[in-house]
Amino acid sequence: MKKRISMIMFICLLLSLTACGVNSGTNSNTEPSATQSQAETPPSEPAAEPTEEAAKMLVVYFSATGNTKAVAEEITRLTGADLYEIVPAVPYTDEDLNYNNNECRANQEMNNASACPAIGSEAMDVSSYDTVFIGYPIWWGTMPRIINTFLDMYDLSGKTVLPFCTSGSSGITQSVSDIRAAEPDADVRDGLRASGANDSSIENWIADNGISE
């Protein structure tokens, strides 16, 4: 009987020692794992500072014969600006542009200070633009009346406005004065008269106004 009790006690002691060994092994395996996990977790990086949004530019132009269009496209190429063509609701024909005929459409419009030729181009939102180039041919010493229509339709207050024109001989000074009168709250800069898209003064004028792509 004593031998049986001793045997049972020996077995219980053996099982107890085995259980302790298992627990000890488990603890030794899990603790380094937690330490390794903490070591591998990279520190959080500070949030990036928001960058200033680049100024948006728009080139607006009216071109009766294609000369002003070529200059407008060159300015767009040099600056990366968006391009918008002012298209008359009623296109101008060759007869409309026959300045030798006092009754031609262009002459009649320029002789009427209140003339407001309709624009057929799709309306656009200019509010997001900081700088607006405005191009046109010179008619009767100033800009065509359809440019007045554009200025009546869109508020350029607070924007930088850069007029440019194409002309064989007439200057741009009067049209710049007219734009300043129409947009008194805009920063209307001195304009550029270009002979064509290859005119080297285009790039110089853009640079002089502190504009780059």
List where the protein language model places each region.
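Sec-dependent N-terminal signal peptides
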Residues: 6-13
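Short, conserved loop/helix-junction motifs that constitute active-site signature segments
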Residues: 126-127, 152-158, 182-183
